[in-house]
């Protein structure tokens, strides 16, 4: 059984036991959360899709940790003009583990 959920402006395909890093959620480490923006649930041959969301479906998860991704470098340059600009960015994330899918 798997589901497609939407959180933080992105869509994720999840199964029970999966760990994934999503955009920062304002919750404590170790707490349980309910993700109710479920787009699709598949159980074997039975596939349920929403338009765009499924009303009764929920995905439950446990917050494992909060952290920051690796730094990415942004480098802008204009040729022949001696214009060079370098910038770094680290995005915050929340790591969750999927504990249940209810349709």
From Swiss-Prot:
GO terms for molecular function: rRNA binding; structural constituent of ribosome. It comes from the Bacteria. The keyword Ribosomal protein applies. Coiled coil: none annotated. GO terms for biological process: translation. InterPro entries: bL21-like, bL21-like_sf, Ribosomal_bL21, Ribosomal_bL21_CS. Pfam families: Ribosomal_L21p (PF00829). GO terms for cellular component: cytoplasm; ribonucleoprotein complex; ribosome. Belongs to the bacterial ribosomal protein bL21 family. This protein binds to 23S rRNA in the presence of protein L20. This is Large ribosomal subunit protein bL21. The lineage of its organism: Bacteria, Pseudomonadati, Pseudomonadota, Betaproteobacteria, Nitrosomonadales. The gene is rplU.
